[in-house]
Every structure is written in C-alpha cells, then in structure tokens.
Amino acid sequence: MITKNELRLYRQLKQEAKELSEQIEELEMTMIVPGCQQITGMPVYHSEDHDKIANVLAKAEQMRKVYFDKVDVLLDLQEKIEVAVAKLEPKERRLIRLYYFAGLTWEEVAVQMDYAWRQTHRLHNICLKKLKMA
C-alpha cells in the first residue's frame, strides 16, 4: 500500500538524494586535497599540520557515512514505491513516474502525455486509489 503522502515524500527525498550525492562528491574532494603536495617544492608537514589533516579526514569520513545512510533510506522507499507502481497500467505508471519521479509539473505531465490537465488529475486519482489498495 502506497499513499499520496509517501509519493510526495519520495519526490522530496529524490531531490535530497541528488543534493546528498553532490555533497558526498565535495567531501571526497576535501579528503583528497589536504594531502596534496605543494607545486613549489617538497612537501613540508609539521606535526600540527598532520594532526589537522587527520582531523579533517576523520570528520569528512563521518559525514560521508551519514550521507550514505540517508541515501540508503531513500533507496528503501524508492524500492517500495517501484514495486507498487509496477502493478499499475502503463499510462498510469508513466503519469506517476513523470510527476513524482521526474519532478515535472502537472502542466508538463499533461503535455508529455498529450492529455488535458483535468484528465491527468482524473488519472492521478485513479492511480492513488489503486496504489492505496495494492
């Protein structure tokens, strides 16, 4: 059983997952950059510098784990929704995917499906009823 609220949540979480992915990439870059050698000469590391770099790397790794945990939760919800949506008719699946997964507006969904705006909402209500029963 999938509710409208879960679908809305999925739409929001999908955007959050994209943002988290970008943050993970940034963190991975910070984990690489501190250990780079200076171009002007030999690397000069004092014990204080080494401790600071180690602290930055440890914090970055902690944040990376937090982000991956969040992405894992998002993927669990996505799997649950995908299983339920798979039981819908093709045009219903398309409507759900365009609006909730691709993040299109209702107007854009109507254009993509070559439906009237009102017709997309009728079909959406049918989808929600079927998903609630599933």
Question: Where do the model's predicted regions map?
Answer:
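Short alpha-helical "recognition helix" segments of helix-turn-helix
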Residues: 108-113
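N-terminal interaction/assembly modules
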Residues: 1-84, 133
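N-terminal positioning helix adjacent to the helix-turn-helix/winged-helix DNA-binding module
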Residues: 77-80, 84, 88-92, 123
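DNA-recognition helix of helix-turn-helix
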Residues: 114-134
